[in-house]
């Protein structure tokens, strides 16, 4: 998407905006298979994704993290220009427990499963 913004002297310049999540057909979704301290930010979640999950964040994949109370979830991804962090807190209900029967450090979800999960569905 290209938009214009005012520039000094009244001239306008066009700036390209990066897509929120580029090339969705090639993006993979990984979920941490244990609860995460929701106080963690960019660096803490990046470390979990690379060290515990063994994945490279800068490929552009999505990384889902859920807090112990299951009221909050965060999604970390790299959009090509920097790290992005989405944070959702449910006003009622709980997110599904991804770590219920997991034997691995992470799970791989489809994009549809991620969407259902973030909407509060138990279908995972």
What residue ranges belong to the model's regions?
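Polybasic/polar functional segments that serve as interface/processing modules
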Residues: 2-124
């Amino acid at each position: 998407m290209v938009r214009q913004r005012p520039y000094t002297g009244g001239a306008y310049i066009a700036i390209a905006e990066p897509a929120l999540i580029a090339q969705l057909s090639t993006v993979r979704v990984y979920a941490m298979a244990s609860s995460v301290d929701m106080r963690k930010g960019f660096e803490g979640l990046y470390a979990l994704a690379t060290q515990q999950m063994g994945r490279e964040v800068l490929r552009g994949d999505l990384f889902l993290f859920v807090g112990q109370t299951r009221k909050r979830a965060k999604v970390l991804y790299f959009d090509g220009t920097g790290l992005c962090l989405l944070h959702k807190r449910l006003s009622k209900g709980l997110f599904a427990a991804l770590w219920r029967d997991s034997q691995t450090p992470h799970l791989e979800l489809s994009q549809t499963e991620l969407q259902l999960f973030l909407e509060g569905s138990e279908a995972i």
